[in-house]
Amino acid sequence: MSIVRRSNVFDPFADLWADPFDTFRSIVPAISGGSSETAAFANARVDWKETPEAHVFKVDLPGVKKEEVKVEVEDGNVLVVSGERSREKEDKNDKWHRVERSSGKFVRRFRLPEDAKVEEVKAGLENGVLTVTVPKAEVKKPEVKAIEISG
């Protein structure tokens, strides 16, 4: 059985030439204990926006269950999103024509700014999108004291 992966769906000619690193990639997973199938999923797409009240992270995790995701804060200011998407069980009688969905472990880390209230982080998973909200501490405006000028 052979599985055909298209490396770039926007370039139909990308698969015409052999990748000189394919041999290396097939060896590396055995050494590192990983899987070449995790490569695309390891780079889960993330949007990070800042609002006046919070930092909001949106992570695309299609097909991942809530129980397969962890959201943590390490070292006081590093947001870590990690987890694993299980591989579909294979039946010996199945014939695969294309495998494009990734499986395996993933991890993303983000250094949070100083104004992040890490003790109030909230996360929710809906429709394959993980939303992590990190509230911001209120920035106190410096007090201005008028000084009377004598003379």
From Swiss-Prot:
The keyword Metal-binding does not apply. One of its GO terms (biological process) is response to heat. This is 16.9 kDa class I heat shock protein 1. Residues 37-151 form the sHSP domain. Keywords: Cytoplasm, Stress response. Its main location: cytoplasm. The gene is hsp16.9A. It comes from the Eukaryota. GO terms for molecular function: protein folding chaperone; unfolded protein binding. GO terms for cellular component: cytoplasm. It is found in: Cytoplasm. Pfam families: HSP20. It comes from Triticum aestivum (Wheat). May form oligomeric structures. The keyword Kinase does not apply. Gene3D superfamilies: 2.60.40.790. Belongs to the small heat shock protein (HSP20) family.
